[in-house]
């Protein structure tokens, strides 16, 4: 199994460094904590190899590291276009996506956002932007080239450049806590399946990872990791998904 999952002798795992649902990087020590760190640590222990965790700026970077053979596994939310480039495991967690709006916004629930004349923002390449482009029928979806900083996003919402912004609930809860003039809607517009990804075409490797995830979910490892990280709107994936 070690030769299949970690051919260099070290398990190399890439994750989205800007997504707190996957993990956080300590600014002083640079150590990674959160579900990604806990899952990689346990997988490496079972395989019997050391590991490294590689921060990546976005989904394209994670896929690029896999294709360049500089990472053995990656962590991404499932979507069909990405599945044409990499193979996805069964999900280990479900990440809820919601909107953040101005505190005085008339938008009270997710369905209110899909109205003519409203501008809904999301970041390019994120699972939320893919979902919103495919599913909003009346509102204008504005795709930003990168995830804006909290300060930039607050300015866009307060100035009226955007009426709402879609992202994972954990990210939005953190943003609203720091900016009282913003609020997160109480409901969610979608749930993204957080999975492990590998290069395409190796069914035996994928089977090993799927068995590991099934065990990690059934044993409570994933739930414990989510609880320890104090993540909002994230749950261990139930059995039988994909």
Q: What is each of the regions a protein language model found here?
A:
Residues 1-77, 146, 219, 228:
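Extracytoplasmic small-molecule ligand-binding "clamshell" domains
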Residues 10-16, 33, 111-129, 139-142:
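Short loop->beta-strand "edge-of-pocket" segments that line small-molecule binding or catalytic clefts
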Residues 3, 127-147, 180-185, 214-242:
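Ligand-binding clefts/hinges and TM-proximal coupling segments of bilobed small-molecule sensing domains
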Residues 23-27, 40-50, 89, 128-146, ...:
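Ligand-binding cleft/hinge of the Venus flytrap
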Residues 17, 94-104, 169, 173-214, ...:
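Periplasmic-binding protein-like
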Residues 53-64, 107-108, 143-155, 192:
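Short helix-initiation/N-cap motifs at beta->coil->alpha
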Residues 92, 101-120:
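Flexible hinge/capping segments at coil-to-helix
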Residues 60, 76-85, 131-134, 158-190:
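A ligand-binding cleft/hinge motif common to bilobed small-molecule-binding domains
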């Amino acid at each position: 199994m070690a030769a299949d999952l970690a051919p260099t002798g070290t398990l190399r795992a890439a994750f989205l460094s800007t997504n707190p649902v996957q993990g956080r990087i300590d600014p002083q020590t640079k150590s990674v904590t959160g579900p990604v760190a806990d899952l990689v640590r346990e997988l490496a222990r079972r395989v019997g190899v050391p590991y490294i965790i590689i921060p990546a700026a976005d989904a394209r970077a994670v896929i690029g590291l896999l294709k360049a053979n500089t990472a053995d596994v990656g962590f991404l939310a499932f979507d069909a276009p990405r599945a044409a480039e990499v193979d996805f495991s069964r999900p280990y967690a479900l990440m809820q996506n919601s909107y953040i709006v101005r505190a005085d916004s008339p938008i009270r629930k997710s369905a209110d956002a899909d109205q003519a004349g409203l501008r809904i923002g999301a970041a390019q390449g994120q699972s939320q932007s893919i979902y919103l482009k495919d599913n909003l029928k009346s509102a204008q979806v504005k795709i930003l080239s990168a995830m804006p900083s909290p300060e930039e996003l607050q300015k866009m919402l307060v100035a009226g450049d955007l009426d709402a912004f879609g992202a994972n609930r954990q990210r939005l809860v953190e943003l609203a806590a720091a900016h009282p003039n913003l609020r997160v809607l109480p409901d969610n517009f979608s749930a993204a399946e957080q999975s492990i990804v590998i290069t395409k075409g190796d069914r035996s490797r994928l089977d090993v990872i799927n068995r590991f995830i099934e065990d990690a979910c059934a044993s409570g490892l994933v739930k414990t990791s989510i609880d320890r990280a104090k993540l909002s709107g994230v749950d261990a994936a139930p059995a039988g998904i994909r």
